[in-house]
């Protein structure tokens, strides 16, 4: 049996045990905590599409394990056919969420390992599992480094900060610890945080459901606000800084993140508040010179008009439901990575680091 070990007091949304994957079902939080057993690559693809697992780094890890499950499904012992079958599995996983670049990064890393392995299919599968586990372990280490660098990047005054964040960027969105919420955790541990303001993050409410849940688990004071209250809170001087995550960052620093992020950046600029993006370098797509080339996922209209079984508004109207928006680099104070905090203009220098 090969098991992914976890610290007992931490949240790990993806767990490998007994040749299968267990995912925390994030669609059931915060009312119910439970795991979903994933035994096939197709089941993993559906779990990513339906956001049982979500967050750019987390779906990268999940996709890597989905590749392992797919490798276990392949029956041929010929490497050439194995690679052809594995590529089809990779293509299916890549179709699940088009914006988050970590997904494609992890899939390509897995395919590279398969191509460069020897001719024995059993050895290739073993190498794929080891690679998926390494991706998971590396992401936890990366998030902790982001937290440390982010702590140093925060404004020196006031000594104790109130930080606004958007969506969920914590342990649930990564392999563990978190990106933007990882910085917040580090600030809390260092005694530099008074409280967190969490946007509810319409339409799927990841801030209200998931960020608030994670903060409560760790004893971090958290206040949930509707998305439309953020500007008012800044105007009333309730916010000292804004920290968000990212799903894809272009080479110039333009950042795609959960819908509503751009609005926050605009109002933060208007109120002279620092606006930080926290993300691993695997989220940076250096092949894109700016954010105009970032694909924006369009999701089901029902996410807007319905919560659970409750209909919120007339269905017989048009709905527009982009999952992400792009914040221009000019609105971003710094991008916090595992290599340090840099301005958007300096990001390109981290490409080969």
From Swiss-Prot:
Gene3D superfamilies: translation initiation factor eif-2b, domain 1, Translation initiation factor eif-2b, domain 2. Catalyzes the interconversion of methylthioribose-1-phosphate (MTR-1-P) into methylthioribulose-1-phosphate (MTRu-1-P). The keyword Amino-acid biosynthesis applies. The record marks 167 as: Transition state stabilizer. Belongs to the eIF-2B alpha/beta/delta subunits family. MtnA subfamily. Pfam families: IF-2B. InterPro entries: IF-2B-related, IF-M1Pi, IF_2B-like_C, Initiation_fac_2B_a/b/d, M1Pi_N, NagB/RpiA_transferase-like. One of its GO terms (molecular function) is S-methyl-5-thioribose-1-phosphate isomerase activity. One of its GO terms (biological process) is L-methionine salvage from methylthioadenosine. This is Methylthioribose-1-phosphate isomerase. PANTHER family: METHYLTHIORIBOSE-1-PHOSPHATE ISOMERASE. Substrate binds at residues 54-56, 97, 206, 257-258. Transmembrane segments: none annotated. Keywords: Amino-acid biosynthesis, Isomerase, Methionine biosynthesis. Its EC number is 5.3.1.23. It comes from the Bacteria.
